[in-house]
Amino acid sequence: MAIDMKAIHDSTHTLVMGVLNITEDSSSDGGLWLDPAKAKAHGEAMMKAGADIIDIGAESTRPGAKRVSEEDEQTRVLGAVDALISEGAVLSIDTTRASVARMALEHGAQIINDVSGGRMDREVPHVVAEHAESLYIVQHWRGWLAGSAGDVPDADTSVYANGVVDDVYDELMKQVDDVLQAGVSPSQIIIDPGLGFSKPSVEHNFPLMVALERFNATGYPVLIGASRKRFVGAALADAGIDEPDMDSKDNATAAISALCAEHGAWAVRVHDVEKSRDAVAIGNAWRAFAND
């Protein structure tokens, strides 16, 4: 099945990216899809539920998570890529390693989702540049504690002297400049403000989502990844919902998905595809009539 990546990149409606964590320790679903057969079945189920893209990650980025070996990450990713590419899936690979990115692209993956935005392994942008038809998600990133795959800061990286929106915008644009210098084409780039990464609170994350149109104005498509993050649960708790469970967080994520679709996000990255699929459909319709 031929994939029109230009159409994926330049979509006029918000896409749904389903999360496939083939990890032992992801915060919400660690261990559930580690078995290759279960990973394939879950990926296929998300496609059937309406996911436009499947985002495969073999290393947890939760706070405090320990890194998996390069060999283990490669093995997990390759198994999932080979299993799903034959089903016509558009595959995004959540990795910070150049070796994993190269292997996945050579086996048919189309998107590299680098939560470090090219900072953890400086070769990743070069690998993307070598694959001119691929896309590269550049996420805002302030650094991790050595030896950890999660956003555990060396110092207090959650302080934004000029306000979270201005600082994240400026820092993310600097990351984009560095990626361009590495040879990545502007047409390959998607940006992500990195919700939850060095942004622990409601006060950090909601202003970034409210400022979505400012990020859209860069001309780069924008990915929003709010699904099941702690600030979503905190917002529910602030509204008087005690100890919100996963279903509550998925409902809240769907509300965020609808709002982000209405305001022109390129895609939303979610765990519960079905709920956000319906929410995004309403947001897309709202946007279409608002712009009519």
Stretches found by the model and what they are:
Residues 185-188:
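Short acidic capping loops at alpha-helix termini that bridge into adjacent secondary structure
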Residues 41-57, 263:
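Catalytic domains of carbohydrate-active enzymes, especially glycoside hydrolases
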Residues 3-5, 10-11, 27-41, 61-79, ...:
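Active-site-adjacent loop and "lid" segments of alpha/beta metabolic enzymes
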